[in-house]
Amino acid sequence: MGRQGNLEELWCLRMPEIITPIITPFTKDNRIDKEKLKIHAENLIRKGIDKLFVNGTTGLGPSLSPEEKLENLKAVYDVTNKIIFQVGGLNLDDAIRLAKLSKDFDIVGIASYAPYYYPRMSEKHLVKYFKTLCEVSPHPVYLYNYPTATGKDIDAKVAKEIGCFTGVKDTIENIIHTLDYKRLNPNMLVYSGSDMLIATVASTGLDGNVAAGSNYLPEVTVTIKKLAMERKIDEALKLQFLHDEVIEASRIFGSLSSNYVLTKYFQGYDLGYPRPPIFPLDDEEERQLIKKVEGIRAKLVELKILKE
């Protein structure tokens, strides 16, 4: 009984996190709308999001100049210091400069994806890229592993060779791939980048999810985590599957563009525009997207997850 009680206590203490890769709002003339960004950050933190991942894919990070990445950091920092600051890019000098500038901010850490586009980069050079960032960073460094987008898989074995990561965001649907980071790097914080694995991650001993859908359904993602941690698995999965339906609907029209529409629909405020070549949805696409998710919203209201 004593051992069982200790296990139950450890289970309750281990609380995985929901991290939002925060959307970057742009004006019609393609500038960052800092006021909208702050409103969004405030809402997310108020609704229980644990940290904000700034300049990620959902935030259209690859389209941002170094100056804009820093601008995003400053705007979000006005709201919270619970920030992982993504600095990566194709110019290592820019990434180094951003990492060094982050010393002026009391944040959680910096992150970087692997250098993308360039084919057949050697593992040796990828390792050198990340080790260089670790050497100059005043904060803990997180790996952002997104093989589909970057063409490089910095898997658990390579991460162990690099040897300086505090954590990883692994954007891949294969949970075994993500679990391998914890197996080979037991002291590393391991986050899944999949929205569809929130309930699963909360049940596996991993450290949480970096979930794009938490931009527009923070209440849902936080509740899925809570239910899973309370071992109310049936309820957690019921909510997870509703969340998955919204994610699937967003992908029909392009998830990066849909995120702006869905945030306005579910959260009630406007996040402006994405940045081309991520174009905004046209009126008909918006109408079709909302039609696909309005029944889900009604169910979430019925479950008292969302307000009327």
Swiss-Prot record:
Listed SUPFAM superfamilies: Aldolase (SSF51569)
Catalyzed chemical reaction(s): 2-dehydro-3-deoxy-6-phospho-D-gluconate = D-glyceraldehyde 3-phosphate + pyruvate; 2-dehydro-3-deoxy-6-phospho-D-galactonate = D-glyceraldehyde 3-phosphate + pyruvate
UniProt site (Proton shuttle): Y144
Pathway: Carbohydrate acid metabolism; 2-dehydro-3-deoxy-D-gluconate degradation; D-glyceraldehyde 3-phosphate and pyruvate from 2-dehydro-3-deoxy-D-gluconate: step 2/2
Annotated active site: K169
GO molecular function annotation: 2-dehydro-3-deoxy-6-phosphogalactonate aldolase activity; 2-dehydro-3-deoxy-phosphogluconate aldolase activity; 4-hydroxy-tetrahydrodipicolinate synthase activity
Lineage: superkingdom: Archaea
Function: Involved in the degradation of glucose and galactose via the Entner-Doudoroff pathway. Catalyzes the reversible cleavage of 2-keto-3-deoxy-6-phosphogluconate (KDPG) and 2-keto-3-deoxygluconate (KDG) forming pyruvate and glyceraldehyde 3-phosphate or glyceraldehyde, respectively. It is also able to catalyze the reversible cleavage of 2-keto-3-deoxy-6-phosphogalactonate (KDPGal) and 2-keto-3-deoxygalactonate (KDGal).
InterPro entries tied to this protein: Aldolase_TIM, DapA-like, ED_pathway_aldolase
Family per record: Belongs to the DapA family. KDPG aldolase subfamily.
E.C. no: 4.1.2.55
EC class (word): lyase
The protein's assembly and partners: Homotetramer; dimer of dimers.
Species assigned in the record: Saccharolobus solfataricus (strain ATCC 35092 / DSM 1617 / JCM 11322 / P2)
Alphabetical UniProt keywords: Carbohydrate metabolism, Lyase, Schiff base
Chain residues that bind substrate: T57, T58, Y144, N145, Y146, K169, D170, T171
Pfam families, sorted: DHDPS
Disulfide bonds: none
Name the record gives this protein: 2-dehydro-3-deoxy-phosphogluconate/2-dehydro-3-deoxy-6-phosphogalactonate aldolase
